[in-house]
Amino acid sequence: MSRYRGPRVRIIRRLGTLPGLTSKTPESKPSYINQSTSSRKISQYRIRLEEKQKLRFHYGITERQLLKYVRIARKAKGSTGQVLLQLLEMRLDNIIFRLGLAPTIPGARQLVNHRHVLVNDCTVDIPSFRCKPQDVITIRDRQKSQNLMKRSRDSYEKYGIPNHLTFNSVQNIGLVNETIDRDWIGLKINELLVVEYYSRQA
């Protein structure tokens, strides 16, 4: 399954707020619609499917990529669900987004693909590159690169940066301090339901 490129508002109307996909928030539905939908019995499969879709659309990854991350998480020590979230959060495109260097994860992926991003002073153009503690993230010292970063930083300041990252706004340097803690994921998600969804495939 390919990466979604359709209307983003349609997705957040169905799944709720997904800051990685879009900064927009879903409009509240009229009460009569909420009453009619709440009276329907929702299957457990659909609940798990929607949690899985939240991860896919928020992080902007394909079905195949998500399944791959689930398989890696299953082999790691610790809670499979939490390891899965940590793997997704440590992707370079997500780190760029969480540092406020891009307005969304798709925007961050563009920065990486177009070679605007340096990790430890080396150009990295792979959005799925897995960052690790003590990695230093910078934007290339080119006018276009710096302008893209500045526009995003100006609009992102109100959200703040999670505690596993640091950004020096004077030198424009981001630092990965540690692996992210579950409390700082910033996405309303039940990761255990995602693991259950893939229980027969992973």
Curated annotation (Swiss-Prot):
Mark the transmembrane ranges: none
> Which subcellular locations apply to this protein?
Plastid, Chloroplast
Q: What GO biological process terms are annotated to this protein in UniProt?
A: ribosomal small subunit biogenesis; translation
Tell me, what is one Gene Ontology molecular-function annotation carried by this entry? Answer: rRNA binding
The cross-references to Pfam families, in alphabetical order and at most eight, read: Ribosomal_S4 (PF00163), S4 (PF01479)
- Can the keyword Ribonucleoprotein be found in this entry's annotation? yes
A Gene Ontology cellular component where this protein is annotated is: small ribosomal subunit
| S4 RNA-binding domain mapped to chain residues | 90-158
Q: Which Gene3D superfamilies match?
A: Ribosomal Protein S4 Delta 41, Chain A, domain 1, RNA-binding S4 domain
Q: Does the keyword Ribonucleoprotein apply?
A: yes
Keywords noted in UniProt: Chloroplast, Plastid, Ribonucleoprotein, Ribosomal protein, RNA-binding, rRNA-binding
Q: Outline what the protein does.
A: One of the primary rRNA binding proteins, it binds directly to 16S rRNA where it nucleates assembly of the body of the 30S subunit.
Its family remark reads: Belongs to the universal ribosomal protein uS4 family.
Name recorded for this polypeptide: Small ribosomal subunit protein uS4c
Report the source organism. Anthoceros angustus
Which gene carries the instructions for this protein? rps4
